[in-house]
Structures are given as C-alpha cells and as structure tokens.
C-alpha cells in the first residue's frame, strides 16, 4: 500500500462540525437581529421659589423621565436591553443669579442615582451609564439648582428633554 491514501470514515468529526455550524448559525442570527431604538421624552421643570437674591440659598427645579412598558415595541418587554447612550437637552432659568445642573440616571425601579454635572442651556450625549442595567422602570432626572433672582418664582426658559438610545 505504498503511496496510497486511506480515508477513514468516522461520524464523530462530522457531528462536531455539524454542532459548530449550528452554533454559528444561531450566533449570527442573534447578531443580525439586534436592533437599536430610541425613546424620546420631554418635560418642563417646575418654577422655583427664590428665597433670597443671593447665591447662598438655592431652590431646585427638576424634570423626570421614566421608561415605561408602552415605550417598548410589543413583544420585546422581556428581551434583554442595553443602554447605548442618553442624549439630553437642558433648559435654564434666565432670571436666576446662578444655576447648577446635573443629569442623574437610575437603574430600573431603583432610588439610587448616578449623576453627572452638565451645563444649563446646553445639550450633549452621555454614554457613562451603558454598564448599568436598563429597561422598564429606568429613569433620568435633570436637576436645576437655582440660586437667587427675581421675581419670587423663577421659571424655566423651556423644557428639558432626553432620548434613551438602546439595543436589544
């Protein structure tokens, strides 16, 4: 049998190859089906009572944006979701002396907040919260700490807004 090539027929390698192909098909199918969606929200923060015309005593106005069941497409509520970014647009209180603004993210149904300082009357994108869980019950609040100003109640110039971008 010199120079002859002998092929051994075995079903074991074929089974492993078939399992590998099946796993790849499932993986590729999951990757292809991943979709990205957005949930836009908008709300005007409330008027703030100004207790003094100085920068030592602040009042707080805020807008709260909660994610609810109806924000998700039908049939996807139970699907795992990953937050991609939070786009934001913050208003300001034009009659105040000074204003500090922060954007805070809360995981689903949690009262703990993870906050980032932002500027009044500005917009931007944050991807700092991507490692945290996201879904029904997640929340963003934009807080406006308003210092001094006239008249007794200072009102915002407009509305705050956020867009939750996520994939599933």
Where in this protein do the model-derived segments appear?
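Disulfide-rich extracellular domains of secreted proteins
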Residues: 35-168
């Amino acid at each position: 049998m010199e120079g002859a090539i002998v092929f051994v027929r075995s079903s074991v390698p074929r089974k492993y190859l078939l399992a590998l192909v099946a796993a790849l098909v499932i993986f590729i199918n999951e990757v292809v089906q991943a979709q990205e969606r957005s949930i836009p929200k908008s709300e005007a923060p409330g008027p703030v009572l100004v207790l003094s015309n100085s920068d030592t005593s602040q009042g707080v106005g805020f807008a709260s944006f909660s994610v609810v069941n109806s924000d998700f497409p039908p049939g996807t509520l139970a699907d795992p979701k990953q937050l991609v970014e939070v786009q934001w647009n913050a208003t300001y209180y034009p009659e105040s002396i000074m204003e500090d603004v922060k954007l805070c993210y809360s995981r689903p149904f949690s009262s703990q907040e993870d906050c980032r300082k932002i500027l009044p009357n500005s917009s931007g994108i944050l991807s700092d919260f991507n490692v945290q869980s996201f879904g029904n019950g997640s929340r963003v609040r934009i807080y406006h700490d308003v210092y001094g100003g006239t008249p007794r109640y200072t009102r915002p110039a407009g509305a705050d807004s956020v867009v939750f971008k996520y994939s599933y």
